[in-house]
């Protein structure tokens, strides 16, 4: 029974394994599909065979491979880079690298290889870089790499090598350029050690012997030897040993000699002129001195250094270098991380390049006299410039490169007169003063590169970049503009291809700012405060490839999104305040449609509304908007209908009452001859003049007056309509300044108009009590129009004027009045009297 159970278990396991896809058990990480794989520290005991044959880069470091057997890499014919660091490899069998014809870099660091057979490196026909650091190698003689005819760089640092002898097989390595033997145990250098170089003068080799405890160099050891570079750093335990060894390097021809110590490896107690005298018998083109503490200031007066082309001091405790003789033919001088004080006022007629950076002491710029200078780097010195920049500052007309970045305050007092050849100018992280007070760069028509980033500049002068007609790179991040608005400062810079406006606190962009930048390829607008994305600003940028608007406050777009240049390939809109609402539906849909060239579009998140905050922009759906639109449309229409009906009812309420009243009283007789509409300010005139002459005169008229005839306890509006209009034949409107300014009077007048329209008769009599300014009268358009087109009565406070006024008013009131016989005789008598 048990064998059957074992058989069943085996079959189930086999079935399970057969269902796994090929390569699913591969522990390696696919960095680039089919190109780069990382198998570091996966406890592999052999080379995995399920990695694609097309792999070019393979990291197998920190795996216990122990032995590299023959044909281990047959499946990797395309491999170019192989890292086998610390794989505990002790043995490399012949033909272990078979098939690696394309391999160019091999790293064997940290493997305790016991021995190398003559065929250990066979098959590596194109290997250019071999790293065998910390392999416990004791000699180059047993390191059989003579077959590596393409080898250019050999690194055997941190080993146990005691002899500097370069074996005979080096004669096969005709392409060898650099050998790193640093941190070994080489103590002596003899004549025979360099026989290979003496017999092969065509080899242009660089040797690094740093950190070897050299205590002697045999006389004539370097006689007739040519090297491209020789590095001797932290090799000598005293100045005397160094002095003796330098004297025995007589006859050496070296392009670049690097001498000194490391920052954390200091052995020499002093370094003076006598130590350097040994170099007088060495032919040197470039000399570099590094990390020397006790340095004699007169060392640069050594005449044997007069003819070198390049001098470099790095980390040297040098205090001043002002007395370099004028006849020195130095063409390049570098002073990096030194302790100069004060600023060196050099006068070297042959100097073309000068670098003074990261000085450890505070210094202020002083004028120079360097007529051949083309390259000047004074960055990272916290220097102050009391005036910049013109020919008088540097004493040259040939300057092409000027770096004044990471300094203190730079006062711009000139516009680079005499420096018209400048092509590169860097002020970043220095504080520029007066840079916007005039066209500072007007003379720099050949300038190609300008960096004024983080210079505390507020740009309020549109002519700041006048003259820069050749400029192709402009960096101005970290500054600000007037009113936080990008103004038209680029009109003259038509050749720009790179423009950085990040972190400029921009909120708006003026129209046409970029319209002349037809060649611009990269525009960085990130880390500003832009609220909208307006494609019209970028419409004329026909060559634009990259646009970065990330880290702004953009909610949506303005204008037509299709106006972006067709050349645009990379667009970054991440980290903005995108509003995922239906109002911006077109913009959100455009974001979805442009996924191909929007950077990290899948990470773009909504900032509002609250219920959508932190959700992905791509998750916003248009269908939601259609539902919302339907609900909102129905709701809005319903509200509008109800509001309109309510408004009409409210607005025409009294008119409706008037209509109803007209129907009710249409067949009844009028009680009053006229209903008087007037302002309370004119009540005295109504009582003393109008009532007295009409109700007590002949014929007599009955007037409806609100203070006398309105029924108490009834709403005023109801009294006006029912007692005033419905029971009166006519309406007298007393027009005055107070009348026009009274909203209640105007309301009564509007009801009177409706009454006149419904009664189909001319029943309104206008009395203009006083002169009213036309400007005031025009405020009531309808009243002004009626007074302009109809006859009205004007009150004149004189005998003749009164006589005519009352005669005309009574005549108007008699129109349509039914008179009894008594009233008729009285009327005739009154008429006779008036005649």
Curated annotation (Swiss-Prot):
Induction: Induced by lipopolysaccharides.
Molecular functions (GO terms): identical protein binding; lipopolysaccharide binding; lipopolysaccharide immune receptor activity; NAD+ nucleosidase activity, cyclic ADP-ribose generating; phosphatidylinositol 3-kinase binding; protein heterodimerization activity; signaling receptor activity; signaling receptor binding
Superkingdom in the source lineage: Eukaryota
Annotated family: Belongs to the Toll-like receptor family.
Glycoprotein recorded as keyword: yes
Keywords, in A-Z order: Cell membrane, Cell projection, Disulfide bond, Endosome, Glycoprotein, Immunity, Inflammatory response, Innate immunity, Leucine-rich repeat, Membrane, NAD, Receptor, Repeat, Signal, Transmembrane, Transmembrane helix, Ubl conjugation
Subunit composition and interactions: Belongs to the lipopolysaccharide (LPS) receptor, a multi-protein complex containing at least CD14, LY96 and TLR4. Binding to bacterial LPS leads to homodimerization. Interacts with LY96 via the extracellular domain. Interacts with MYD88 and TIRAP via their respective TIR domains. Interacts with TICAM2. Interacts with NOX4. Interacts with CNPY3 and HSP90B1; this interaction is required for proper folding in the endoplasmic reticulum. Interacts with MAP3K21; this interaction leads to negative regulation of TLR4 signaling.
Signal peptide: 1-25
GO biological process: activation of innate immune response; astrocyte development; B cell proliferation; B cell proliferation involved in immune response; cellular response to amyloid-beta; cellular response to lipopolysaccharide; cellular response to lipoteichoic acid; cellular response to mechanical stimulus
Protein name: Toll-like receptor 4
Gene expressing this chain: Tlr4
Membrane-topology annotation of the record: Single-pass type I membrane protein
Record-linked InterPro entries: Leu-rich_rpt, Leu-rich_rpt_typical-subtyp, LRR_dom_sf, TIR_dom, Toll-like_receptor, Toll_tir_struct_dom_sf
Main localization (coarse): membrane
Segments forming domain LRRCT: 576-627
Disulphide bridges: 28-39, 280-304, 388-389, 580-606, 582-625
One annotated Gene Ontology cellular component of this protein: cell surface
Role according to the record: Transmembrane receptor that functions as a pattern recognition receptor recognizing pathogen- and damage-associated molecular patterns (PAMPs and DAMPs) to induce innate immune responses via downstream signaling pathways. At the plasma membrane, cooperates with LY96 to mediate the innate immune response to bacterial lipopolysaccharide (LPS). Also involved in LPS-independent inflammatory responses triggered by free fatty acids, such as palmitate, and Ni(2+). Mechanistically, acts via MYD88, TIRAP and TRAF6, leading to NF-kappa-B activation, cytokine secretion and the inflammatory response.
Domain notes: The TIR domain mediates interaction with NOX4.
Glycosylation sites: 34, 43, 75, 172, 204, 237, 248, 281, 307, 492, 495, 524, 572, 575, 622
Every TIR domain range: 670-813
LRR repeats: 54-75, 78-99, 102-123, 126-147, 150-171, 175-198, 204-224, 226-247, 372-381, 398-420, 421-442, 446-467, 470-491, 495-516, 519-540, 543-564
Transmembrane segment boundaries: 639-659
UniProt subcellular location: Cell membrane; Early endosome; Cell projection, Ruffle
């Amino acid at each position: 029974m048990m064998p059957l159970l074992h058989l069943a278990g085996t079959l189930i396991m086999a079935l399970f394994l057969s269902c796994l896809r090929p390569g699913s058990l591969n522990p390696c990480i696919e960095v680039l599909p089919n190109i780069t794989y990382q198998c570091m520290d996966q406890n592999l005991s052999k080379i995995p065979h399920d990695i694609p044959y097309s792999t070019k880069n393979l990291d197998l470091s920190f795996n216990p491979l122990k032995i590299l057997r023959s044909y281990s890499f047959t499946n990797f014919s395309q491999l170019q880079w192989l890292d086998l660091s610390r794989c505990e490899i002790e043995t490399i069998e012949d033909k272990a690298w078979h098939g690696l014809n394309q391999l160019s870099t091999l790293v064997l660091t940290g493997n305790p290889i016991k021995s190398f057979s003559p065929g250990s490196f066979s098959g590596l026909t194109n290997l250019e870089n071999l790293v065998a650091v910390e392999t416990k190698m004791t000699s180059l003689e047993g390191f059989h790499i003579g077959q590596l005819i393409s080898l250019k760089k050999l690194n055997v640092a941190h080993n146990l090598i005691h002899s500097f002898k370069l074996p005979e097989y080096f004669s096969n390595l005709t392409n060898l350029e650099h050998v790193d033997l640093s941190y070994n145990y080489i103590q002596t250098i003899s004549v025979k050690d360099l026989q290979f170089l003496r017999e092969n003068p065509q080899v242009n080799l660089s040797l690094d012997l740093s950190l070897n405890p050299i205590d002697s160099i045999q006389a004539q050891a370097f006689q007739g030897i040519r090297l491209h570079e020789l590095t001797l750093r932290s090799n000598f335990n005293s100045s005397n040993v160094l002095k003796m060894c330098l004297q025995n390097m007589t006859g050496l021809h070296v392009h670049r000699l690097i001498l000194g110590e490391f920052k954390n490896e200091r052995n020499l107690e002093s370094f003076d002129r006598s130590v350097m005298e040994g170099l007088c018998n060495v032919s040197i083109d470039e000399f570099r001195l590094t990390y020397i503490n006790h340095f004699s200031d007169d060392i640069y007066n050594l005449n044997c250094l007069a003819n070198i082309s390049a001098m470099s001091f790095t980390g040297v405790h040098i205090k001043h270098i002002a007395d370099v003789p004028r006849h020195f033919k130095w063409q390049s001088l570098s002073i990096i991380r030194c302790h100069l004080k004060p600023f060196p006022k050099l006068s070297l007629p042959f100097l073309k390049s000068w670098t003074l950076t990261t000085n450890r002491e505070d210094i202020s710029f002083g004028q120079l006299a360097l007529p051949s200078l083309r390259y000047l780097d004074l960055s990272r010195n916290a220097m102050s410039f009391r005036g910049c920049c013109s020919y008088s500052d540097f004493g040259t007309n040939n300057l092409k490169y000027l770096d004044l970045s990471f300094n203190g305050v730079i006062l711009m007092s000139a516009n680079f007169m005499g420096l018209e050849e400048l092509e590169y100018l860097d002020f970043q992280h220095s504080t520029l003063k007066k840079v916007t007070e005039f066209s500072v760069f007007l003379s720099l028509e050949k300038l190609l590169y300008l960096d004024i980033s983080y210079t505390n500049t507020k740009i309020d002068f549109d002519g700041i970049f006048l003259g820069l007609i050749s400029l192709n790179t402009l960096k101005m991040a970290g500054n600000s503009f007037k009113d936080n608005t990008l103004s038209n400062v680029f009109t003259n810079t038509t050749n720009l291809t790179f423009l950085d406006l990040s972190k400029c606190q921009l909120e708006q962009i003026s129209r046409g700012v970029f319209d002349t930048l037809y060649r611009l390829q990269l525009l960085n607008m990130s880390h500003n405060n832009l609220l909208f994305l307006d494609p019209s600003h970028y419409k004329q940028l026909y060559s634009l490839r990259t646009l970065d608007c990330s880290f702004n406050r953009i909610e949506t777009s303005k204008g037509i999104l299709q106006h972006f240049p067709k050349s645009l390939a990379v667009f970054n809109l991440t980290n903005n305040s995108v509003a995922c609402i239906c109002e911006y539906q077109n913009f959100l849909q455009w974001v979805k449609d442009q996924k191909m060239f929007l950077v990290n579009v899948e990470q773009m998140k909504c900032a509002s509304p609250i219920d959508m905050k932190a959700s992905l922009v791509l998750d916003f759906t248009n269908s939601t908007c259609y539902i919302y639109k339907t609900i909102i449309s129905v709701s809005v229409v319903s509200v509008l209908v109800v509001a309109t009906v309510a408004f009409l009812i409210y607005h025409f309420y009294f008119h409706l009452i008037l209509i109803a009243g007209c129907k009710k009283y249409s067949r009844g007789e009028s009680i009053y001859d006229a209903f008087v509409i007037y302002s309370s300010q004119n009540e005295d005139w109504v009582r003393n003049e109008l009532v007295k002459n009409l109700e007590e005169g002949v014929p007599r008229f009955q007037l409806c007056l609100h203070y006398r005839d309105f029924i108490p306890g009834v709403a005023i509006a109801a009294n006006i309509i029912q007692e005033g209009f419905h029971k009166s034949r006519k309406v007298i409107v007393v027009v005055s300044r107070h009348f026009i300014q009274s909203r209640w009077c105007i309301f009564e007048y509007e009801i009177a108009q409706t009454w006149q329209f419904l009664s189909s008769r001319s029943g309104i009599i206008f009395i203009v009590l006083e002169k009213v300014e036309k400007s005031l009268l025009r405020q009531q358009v309808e009243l002004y129009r009626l007074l302009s087109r109809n006859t009205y009565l004007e009150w004149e406070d004189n005998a003749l004027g009164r006589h005519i006024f009352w005669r005309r008013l009574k005549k108007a009131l008699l129109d349509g009045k039914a008179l009894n016989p008594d009233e008729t005789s009285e009327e005739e008598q009154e008429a006779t009297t008036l005649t």
